[in-house]
C-alpha cells in the first residue's frame, strides 16, 4: 500500500498543474477575441456611415435643376453648331478658326497649321544650278607685255620677283624689272592656277640656283646636266674629287 500511495501523490500534483495551465490559457485567449470583435464592429460602423453619406450626396446631386427648360433649347442648338458646323451648312469648310455659335463675327478663312517652308524645303535647300561652280578661276596676276611704261614694268616686276630670286640676281648680275620670261607651255600651265606668280618665282629661283651650282663645280664635257639645263641632283663633292 505504501508503494501505491507514493505513486498517486505525484500523479495528482501533475493533474493539478495541468488544470491550472489550462485555466490560464482560457483566460488569456478571451480578451483577444473580445478586442477583435470590437475592432470589427467599429469598422462595420464606419463603413455604414460612409455608405450613408455617399447615398446622401448622390441624392443631392440627382436633384432637378430649378428653372424653365424652354430657355435651354437655343443654347443647346448653338453648342451643336459649335462642335458640328456641318449640321446647318453642309458646304461649309471643315476647319474654321472661330466656331459659328450665334453667327456673330464668324471667320471662314482656313489657316494651314503647317508652314509653307515645310512644303518648299526641297526647293530652298537645293543650291542654284551653275555649270561653272566647280571650275577654277584663272586669275592672271602678271603678264609679260612689251608695250608697257617704266612705271608699270617696275610695279609688275615687284609682284613677280621674290626675296630669294632678288638676292641671287644681285650675285649673278642685273636683271630686268619685267616678269621672268618663260616658254609658252610654262605660261599655259601657270595660267591654269591662281598662284601663277609663286610658280614663276620658284622656277626662276631654281634656274638661278642651277646656274650657280654649275659655275661653282663644272661637270665633265657632254654631261646630261648641260643638255637638260636643269639638273635634278648636283654632286659637287664627287665632281671635285674626280677632277
Swiss-Prot record:
Lipidation (S-palmitoyl cysteine): 25, 28
Post-translational modification remark: Phosphorylated on tyrosines following cross-linking of BCR in B-cells, FCGR1 in myeloid cells, or FCER1 in mast cells; which induces the recruitment of GRB2. May be polyubiquitinated.
Membrane topology: Single-pass type III membrane protein
Signal peptide: none
Domain of life, per lineage: Eukaryota
Assembly description: When phosphorylated, interacts with GRB2. May also interact with SOS1, GAB1 and CBL.
Side Extracellular, residues: 1-5
Annotated consequence of substituting residue 95 to F: Slightly reduces phosphorylation upon BCR activation
Organism: Homo sapiens (Human)
Protein name, entry field: Linker for activation of T-cells family member 2
Disease: LAT2 is located in the Williams-Beuren syndrome (WBS) critical region. WBS results from a hemizygous deletion of several genes on chromosome 7q11.23, thought to arise as a consequence of unequal crossing over between highly homologous low-copy repeat sequences flanking the deleted region. Haploinsufficiency of LAT2 may be the cause of certain cardiovascular and musculo-skeletal abnormalities observed in the disease.
Tissues of expression: Highly expressed in spleen, peripheral blood lymphocytes, and germinal centers of lymph nodes. Also expressed in placenta, lung, pancreas and small intestine. Present in B-cells, NK cells and monocytes. Absent from T-cells (at protein level).
Subcellular location: Cell membrane
Gene Ontology biological process terms, A to Z: adaptive immune response; B cell activation; B cell receptor signaling pathway; calcium-mediated signaling; intracellular signal transduction; mast cell degranulation
Role summary: Involved in FCER1 (high affinity immunoglobulin epsilon receptor)-mediated signaling in mast cells. May also be involved in BCR (B-cell antigen receptor)-mediated signaling in B-cells and FCGR1 (high affinity immunoglobulin gamma Fc receptor I)-mediated signaling in myeloid cells. Couples activation of these receptors and their associated kinases with distal intracellular events through the recruitment of GRB2.
Gene Ontology terms, MF aspect: SH2 domain binding
GO cellular component terms listed in the entry, alphabetical order: extracellular exosome; membrane raft; plasma membrane
Any matching Pfam family: LAT2
Entry-annotated residues carrying Phosphoserine: 44, 59, 92
Amino acid at each position: 500500500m505504501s508503494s501505491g500511495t507514493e505513486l498517486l501523490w505525484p500523479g495528482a500534483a501533475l493533474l493539478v498543474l495541468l488544470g491550472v495551465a489550462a485555466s490560464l490559457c482560457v483566460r488569456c485567449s478571451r480578451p483577444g477575441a473580445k478586442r477583435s470583435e470590437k475592432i470589427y464592429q467599429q469598422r462595420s460602423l464606419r463603413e455604414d456611415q460612409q455608405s450613408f453619406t455617399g447615398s446622401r450626396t448622390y441624392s443631392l446631386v440627382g436633384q432637378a435643376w430649378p428653372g424653365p427648360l424652354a430657355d435651354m433649347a437655343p443654347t443647346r442648338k448653338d453648342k451643336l453648331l459649335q462642335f458640328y458646323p456641318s449640321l446647318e451648312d453642309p458646304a461649309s469648310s471643315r476647319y474654321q478658326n472661330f466656331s459659328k455659335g450665334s453667327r456673330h463675327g464668324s471667320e471662314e478663312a482656313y489657316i494651314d497649321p503647317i508652314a509653307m517652308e515645310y512644303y518648299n524645303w526641297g526647293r530652298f535647300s537645293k543650291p542654284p544650278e551653275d555649270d561653272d561652280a566647280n571650275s577654277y578661276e584663272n586669275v592672271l596676276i602678271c603678264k609679260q607685255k612689251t608695250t608697257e611704261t617704266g612705271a608699270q614694268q617696275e610695279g609688275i616686276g615687284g609682284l613677280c620677283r621674290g626675296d630669294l630670286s632678288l638676292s641671287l640676281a644681285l650675285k649673278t648680275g642685273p636683271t630686268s624689272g619685267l616678269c621672268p620670261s618663260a616658254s609658252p607651255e610654262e605660261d599655259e600651265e601657270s595660267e591654269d592656277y591662281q598662284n601663277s606668280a609663286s610658280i614663276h618665282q620658284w622656277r626662276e629661283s631654281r634656274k638661278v640656283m642651277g646656274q650657280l651650282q654649275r659655275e661653282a663645280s663644272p661637270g665633265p664635257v657632254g654631261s646630261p646636266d648641260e643638255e637638260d639645263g636643269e639638273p635634278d641632283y648636283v654632286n659637287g663633292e664627287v665632281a671635285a674629287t674626280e677632277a
